[in-house]
């Protein structure tokens, strides 16, 4: 069986320990704060906790994709050794990172015509993307081939459910997801939007919750509707500095389902730049992505 490596990018928000344990190659997107550029990799000097404290101070970060040059540099190290590459990319609907990787592949194929570089537009983000990478890495550990893993991810990426809620509407307003009027009314009425990632990898609103407690209940209810074979699943929960809510949601899940495991971790600095503080998300395999 041919040798291969798995790549992803930092939009997957996988914890440092998991990236190292599962031997995943990681490329960091970039977060810009006060004219300082931070590469969002597993050894980033800006921790999620410190990042969210900066958001509380009113700082508004911006982000940028991984460019094709960095992909060429990272991929070529393996290609020139004849090692195949499987890259699971951040949703093309949310970032140009996937397109950068395609440009890099074409450039490398001109130099190395026999290079085997498989690229998947996961149409996923945050720990939803991370969960696909986790399953891919576990399959590699179990001896599956690159072709088997590639096929599994392509077949299952539109069953990877992303459901989340945000505590503040400010960042959605800034990103053009809702109007200033809707944000003002929503904040006044304590309305919490409920969102999901659709089959195209785009963010969409599917409901509104009155208050935080109701929004957590609705996340759990969406999981109840969609989850398949829960006793065989590892569920990921991501939060932007609201770990108590994440633990509450995890307990709701454990009380009903004998899941294999639940991982709770921070939303990273790139995704967090667009969601803001108080976002809570749950990721799992379901019958369909759509609510």
Swiss-Prot record:
Keywords: Lipid-binding. Hexadecanoate binds at residues 63, 95. Gene3D superfamilies: 3.30.1180.10, degv family protein (2.20.28.50), Dihydroxyacetone kinase, domain 1 (3.40.50.10440). Pfam families: DegV (PF02645). PROSITE patterns: DEGV. The keyword Zinc-finger does not apply. This is DegV domain-containing protein CPE0026. May bind long-chain fatty acids, such as palmitate, and may play a role in lipid transport or fatty acid metabolism. The keyword rRNA-binding does not apply. It comes from the Bacteria. Residues 4-286 form the DegV domain. GO terms for molecular function: lipid binding. NCBIfam families: DegV.
């Amino acid at each position: 069986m041919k040798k291969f490596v798995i790549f992803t990018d930092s939009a997957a928000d996988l914890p440092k320990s998991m990236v190292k344990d599962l031997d995943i190659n990681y490329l960091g997107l970039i977060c810009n704060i006060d004219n300082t550029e931070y590469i969002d990799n597993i050894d980033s000097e800006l921790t999620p906790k410190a990042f969210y404290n900066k958001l509380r101070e009113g700082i508004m970060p911006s982000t940028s994709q991984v460019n094709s040059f960095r992909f060429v540099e990272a991929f070529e190290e393996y290609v020139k050794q004849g090692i195949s590459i499987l890259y699971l990319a951040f949703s093309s609907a949310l970032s140009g990172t996937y397109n950068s990787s395609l440009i890099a592949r074409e450039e490398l194929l001109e130099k190395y015509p026999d290079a085997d570089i498989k690229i998947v537009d996961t149409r996923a983000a945050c720990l939803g993307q991370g969960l696909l990478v986790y399953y891919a890495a576990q399959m590699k550990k179990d001896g599956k081939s690159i072709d088997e893993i590639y096929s599994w991810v392509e077949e299952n990426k539109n069953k990877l459910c992303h459901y989340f809620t945000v505590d503040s509407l400010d960042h959605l307003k800034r990103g053009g997801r809702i109007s200033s009027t809707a944000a003002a009314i929503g904040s006044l009425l304590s309305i919490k939007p409920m969102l999901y990632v659709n089959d195209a990898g785009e963010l969409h609103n599917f409901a509104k919750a009155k208050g935080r407690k109701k929004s957590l209940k609705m996340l759990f209810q969406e999981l109840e509707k969609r989850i398949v074979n829960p006793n065989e699943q590892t569920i990921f929960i991501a939060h932007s500095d609201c770990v108590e809510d994440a633990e509450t949601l995890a307990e709701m899940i454990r009380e009903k389902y004998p899941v294999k495991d639940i991982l709770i971790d921070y939303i990273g600095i790139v995704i967090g730049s667009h969601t803001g503080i108080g976002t809570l998300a749950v990721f799992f395999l379901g019958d369909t992505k759509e609510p």
